[in-house]
Amino acid sequence: MNTFEINRVLERFDVDPDRGFLPPEDPLERMPARWSAWDQLGSDLSALIAIGTARRAIRELPDVDTDDLRNPAELRRAMLLLSVFGNAHVFCEPDPGLRLPAGLCRAWNAVANRLERPMIIAHASIVLHNWRRLDPSGPIVAENLRALQCFRGGPDEEWFYLLTAEIEATGARALPALVGLRLAIDRNRHDGVAEHLDHVSETILEMTRVLERMEERCRHAVFYRRIRPFLSGWPEPGVVYEGIDSEPVTLHGGSAAQSSLLNAFDAALSVPHEHPGTRPFLQAMRRYMPPRHRRFIEWLEEGDSLRTVVEDDGRLAARYDECIDGLVRFRRTHQQITMRYITGQAPDRDRAIGTGGTDYADFLRRTRIETSDRRLH
């Protein structure tokens, strides 16, 4: 399969050949003048949270029409800001603000509907669309990035988002290979499979090396007490979106499971998650992804099983197992780091819940085991 053909598939699903699920152009840093009040509140938000007036400021946001927001970059920036305001309103004070104001909700609902995503903070906004480069010609690595928007602010919160963005940028290098694998299997042409598998395993190793740096600049206690609460979801009894729906809504919070990247590796490498403790949550998380990205994962899943194709070829089976081993190492590393950030900080076991609302330790352990079980030899 030639590069042109692979890139055509990626383009169909809004996946950039170089940046993967990150936007093809650097995220918009400011809204057009008509929506400047959102930018101003975003700039002031950390200070307002610190002095206890953020909720009032969010409730006083002007009710601005969004019909003229059509540019994808503008919609993504709007979704980032409005999602941050929504989660900040709920969690910026000890008593949750469970009734979101109509002025915020009407704009948020219009933007979310166009993007086909729920009205809550998600990986797509806080990671994929939340960075700028210090050196515009430099690489997308954490040291060359600054977050466009934070809740409380500070280097720990920025590092958490930006290193995750670097993982996305690193993993992007394997996405053309995943497409190449699917096309090769579809056409029963296996001559390029070994090279694609090598590229995938090397990329997963690099992703793990980036992930291992999380604790360099994001302290456990700061994450648990200052960052994690704002990334939480709406558990029972739920949140009311005034002006949109009078009934409370429950939603999951931001979660690494909302990243299309690991889901794409699982789909291409024939790693199903069928356990009752993993499948329902992973399927639910797709709703929080950009719609074309989730369709890309579905397209990868629809192909014939890569595992079945390579299992009788010793050379390809060994390379396949290297990819599986790499995914297991990545998931083990993620599990270990998460344990230190959450379980190690939680005052009791009952509060050791991930931002997505799961018993994260059991979920991460099971996804790792399901991955390991796919080894051929």
Regions found by a protein language model. Give the residues of each.
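Surface-exposed peri-terminal alpha-helical interaction modules
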Residues: 1-377
